[in-house]
Curated annotation (Swiss-Prot):
Family membership noted in the UniProt record: Belongs to the RraA family.
Entry GO CC: cytosol
Protein name: Regulator of ribonuclease activity A
This protein's record includes keyword Cytoplasm: yes
GO MF annotations in UniProt: endoribonuclease inhibitor activity; enzyme binding
Subunit structure: Homotrimer. Binds to both RNA-binding sites in the C-terminal region of Rne and to RhlB.
Source organism, top-level taxon: Bacteria
Compartments reported by the entry: Cytoplasm
Main location class: cytoplasm
Length: 161
């Protein structure tokens, strides 16, 4: 499904929170949306592998990587896993790598930056926790919509039709 965050903001102005414009699109989908699962991890993506092995239809993985751009939390292998398991998108408050491969995949990926250095894979982090970045507090179960213009958040799903 295609989302227009500008239009959604016009219609649902009182119901959405707008994330500060920190992110760029690195995935093959220009827009995506779904119910979020939150993750907090710093320069370690082991937990992301576990979560992205689950069916992701209708879901977006939202990762608070502490804003670190020293190590990439998502690479082509991890993004391929997410695509195979039908995740709608990934929002990474951190970095990604292998961006030429990422843009070929049918998944939305928003992140702060790209860097060639990979993350550790120890599995250190927590999921389903409250995270805060970009001026917005995120909870698992909230609904996120993203496109090349921005990212918005709603407690409830927005009627897109």
């Amino acid at each position: 499904m295609k989302y227009d965050t500008s239009e959604l903001c016009d219609i649902y102005q009182e119901d959405v929170n707008v994330v500060e414009p920190l992110f760029s699109n690195f995935g093959g989908r220009s827009s995506f949306g779904g119910q979020i699962i939150t993750v907090k991890c710093f320069e370690d993506n082991g937990l992301l592998y576990d979560l992205l092995e689950q069916n992701g239809r209708g879901r977006v993985l939202l990762v608070d990587g502490g804003g670190s751009v020293r190590r990439a939390l998502v690479d082509a292998e991890l993004a391929r896993l997410a695509t195979q398991n039908e995740w709608e998108g990934l929002v990474i408050y951190g970095a990604v790598r292998q961006v030429d491969d990422l843009e070929e995949l049918d998944i939305g990926i928003q992140a702060i930056a790209a860097i060639p250095v990979g993350a550790a894979g120890e599995g250190i982090g927590e999921s389903d926790v409250r995270v805060n970045f970009g001026g917005v507090t995120f909870f698992s179960g909230d609904h996120l919509y993203a496109d090349n213009t921005g990212i918005i958040l709603s407690e409830d799903p927005l009627d897109i039709e």
